[in-house]
Each structure stands twice: as C-alpha cells, then as structure tokens.
Amino acid sequence: AAVGVVAYNGYTKSAKVNAVKSNHALAVKVITAQLTRVDIDNQIEAWNYSSKKCELRTAHVNFDSNMGLAFSCLNEDPQYKNPFNNSDNEGAFWQNWDVPNVQQIGRTACNYRSDKDRIDCNSRWGEGANDYETTIIPRF
C-alpha cells in the first residue's frame, strides 16, 4: 500500500505542475490575443467588476494599461485556483513581473515592465531554483 501512496503522490504533484504550465500558456495566449485585438479594432476583453465577468470594451490608449485589462480576465476570475494551494487568496494568476517565490508555488505572474518595455510572465511549480517558467512578450 505504501508504494501506491508514493505513486499517487507523485501523480498528483505531476498533475499540479502540468496545471501551472497550462495556466502559464493560457496567460501568454490571452495577453497576446487581446493586445493583438487592440491593434486590429481598438477593443479588448476586460474584467467587469460589477457583472463579475469578462466583457468587450474599448481599449485604453496606453499599452501597459491594456496589458492589465487583458490579464484581469484571468487574475480577477475566481474560477482560477492555485493548483498547489486552493485557499490562496490570489488564486492562480497574480499581476506582478517577479518570479513567484517558494511560498507562492502554483502562481502565474504577468505584468508590463516599463524599465524593459515588455511583459514578463513567470510561473512557479516547485521549490527548486529552476522550478519556474518565464515567457517574455515584447511590446508590439
């Protein structure tokens, strides 16, 4: 039975790691798609705090503001839970450009960096020094 518990624990950790990687890919996809939409028709999907859902609206004039609007559909939506910690009040997505620290395992953090004129997305899935993924989205 002990072997089964070890195998199960390994499976659940692997599933959580895969969920973090999937969330990372989703964040990059959503941000890129929404910023492309801004370039095409000056529209963007953003979280509506009154209706508690994502809705199409006119884009902001600033790139960094539009990044925040695009990401709000993820980081404000309560359906996205931290795969490693369901009671994490920040959820799976967090608007920040830093790599989440080991206390924040399971989070995907994205934000515009004005000092580098780009968007950094970082996701942590473990306690190791290299247990995270980074994607840089250049300004376009």
Question: Where would I find each of the regions flagged by the language model?
Answer:
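Context-gated lysine
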Residues: K13-K16, K21, K29, K52-K53, ...
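N-terminal alpha-helical signal peptides/signal-anchor transmembrane segments
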Residues: N23-N42
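Periplasmic/extracellular, small/polar-rich flexible segments of pilin-like filament-forming proteins
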Residues: T36-F140
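Amphipathic alpha-helical segments typified by the pilin-like N-terminal helix
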Residues: A1-A25
